[in-house]
A protein has these predicted regions:
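Loop-to-helix entry and N-terminal half of a specific, functionally important transmembrane alpha helix
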Residues: 34-42, 362-391, 406-411
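Long extracytoplasmic/lumenal interhelical loops at the membrane interface
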Residues: 162, 166, 288-345, 361-367
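N-terminal signal-anchor transmembrane segment
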Residues: 2-76, 88-102, 385, 402
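Transmembrane alpha-helices of multi-pass inner-membrane enzymes
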Residues: 61-67, 377-386, 393-440
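Aromatic-anchored transmembrane helix interface
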Residues: 81-93, 102-126, 136-145, 149
Length: 458
């Protein structure tokens, strides 16, 4: 009786979480409902990049403003993330100063700052009520990806004629202006569906398989070499993380078996698609490791080699969007772009952000916590984009900033969870997130590493 009473007293003394939670107040409950109602189209319209302004902006600004008013807060686990983002954008601002009279660099810098705000918002938003919010956002992202994939497929086969949807050089683009962005955008949704199928969490597996087939077709018809490779690497990384952290031999066998089934089905679908002459010809052309525009002194890689000595000599870089004026092309490398657009401060801040996020991401995926499953979807998706950043400019991709916010929101939630466990070890075990022993047992049941689960419950 004494333990239960002390547990209840401790529970009452715990600080309110930042989703905040005056659930008994009808007005606040209604505003929270409105906040979630705005969040879904906010995420869904991420794929609408061909309109200026986009429906994304019409929902993003009121959704973020409302949630800020509802009391989401910056947790200590995301402070490093915010600091590095601010340093990166300070570098952009300093590099912009000589070109403040030019509209395009100024507009680009404003867009960068806007995306930074969305990333910080997501890191704050996902730090509380984490699993429920992430599940909602993943579902909205899958819906967005299905729409984008269907639009891409329609654009490839010109189902609605020319002009309505984007098609570039015979490649599907749909609602995106660039097929490479379409292909990459679809990857996190594919990871979510594969993770649920392999992990046995899909409520209606037939629908999940159908959705995955549509998304895979969208990725394939984008004929983006980077997206093809990224899909394979991200999926293998995620499946390896699932297998590595599973303590159940039965679950490990299931993971391996279903991974082979998905791989075999993909191979069969690829062979069938290549039976079409036009698709086979396009595939053969795009399957080359390098294209003509990549090669030579004035090609993509040649420009990068020529540009690096210039960036070493210029602490303020070239200035936002100045690389294209010097070399006639974008850098097609976000790491070089960080130094070109933001100077040494921007470039090194971006590198530090990537390294810090990599450390946090793999720790989230490999360390048992209530948020491990979501991390094993979000981090491989972001990880592959950070690898793609070596061969394409990802610094204005909305979904990259969403995933940055996810990873750091998960880290903030994990640290907050650990802190609550240490402060309140006698809490009742009804919620495993608030009790070390129950949490360890729960993690073990979910397939976490036994030693790590025991350490959590120690």
């Amino acid at each position: 009786m004494g333990t239960a009473s002390s547990g209840i007293a401790i529970a009452r003394s715990l600080p309110l979480r930042g989703d905040g939670v005056r659930r008994g107040i009808p007005v606040v409950a209604a505003l929270r409902g409105l906040g979630y109602a705005l969040l879904v189209p906010f995420i869904f319209f991420i794929c609408f990049t061909f309109l200026r302004p986009s429906p994304y902006d019409f929902f993003a600004i009121p959704a973020m403003a409302l949630w800020f008013c509802l009391g989401i807060r910056l947790h200590r686990g995301a402070v490093v993330f915010v600091a590095l983002l601010l340093l990166y954008h300070l570098g952009l601002l300093l590099a912009l100063l000589p070109y403040f009279e030019e509209p395009r660099p100024v507009e680009w810098s404003y867009q960068s700052a806007y995306l930074m705000v969305t990333a910080i918002f997501f890191a704050m938003f996902f730090a509380d009520d984490t699993r429920r919010r992430l599940e909602l956002v993943f579902k909205a992202y899958v819906a967005s990806s299905l729409f984008a994939a269907c639009a891409g497929i329609a654009s490839y086969f010109e189902l609605f004629g020319e002009g309505l949807l984007f098609r570039m050089d015979g490649r599907a683009a749909g609602v995106f202006e660039d097929p490479n962005v379409l292909g990459s955008f679809l990857i996190p949704a594919a990871l979510y569906l594969v993770h649920n199928l392999v992990g046995g969490r899909s409520r209606v597996p037939v629908l999940a398989v159908a959705a995955l087939a549509v998304i895979a077709a969208g990725i394939f018809l984008s004929f983006s070499r980077g997206s093809w490779a990224a899909t394979v690497i991200a999926t293998v990384t995620m499946v390896w993380l699932m297998h590595r952290t599973s303590a159940s031999a039965r679950l490990r066998r299931r993971i391996v078996a279903l991974a082979f089934v998905i791989a075999a089905a993909t191979a069969i679908a690829l062979v069938a698609a290549l039976g079409d002459g036009d698709i086979a010809e396009r595939f053969e052309d795009r399957a080359q490791v390098t294209k003509e525009y990549d090669q030579g002194v004035t090609g993509r890689f040649g420009n990068q080699i020529r540009g690096i000595p210039m960036l070493i000599e210029r602490p303020n870089g070239l200035g936002p969007l100045r690389w294209r004026l010097t070399f006639g092309l974008e850098p097609h490398n976000s790491y070089i772009g960080g130094f070109a657009n933001g100077g040494w401060l921007g470039g090194f801040s971006f590198l530090a952000l990537v390294l810090a996020t990599g450390f946090v991401g793999f720790r989230l995926c490999l360390t048992p916590s209530p948020f491990q499953r979501q991390a094993q979807i979000a981090w491989p998706g972001l990880f592959i984009f950070l690898l793609q950043a070596l061969q394409i400019d990802v610094d204005h991709w909305r979904h990259v900033f969403l995933l940055f916010g996810m990873v750091w929101g998960l880290e903030a939630a994990r640290l907050d969870w650990l802190g609550r466990l240490r402060r309140s070890p006698t809490l009742p075990a009804r919620n495993p997130d608030n009790n070390p022993a129950a949490a360890g047992a729960s993690l073990a049941r979910r397939g976490a590493d036994p030693a790590a689960a025991a350490a959590v419950g120690a």
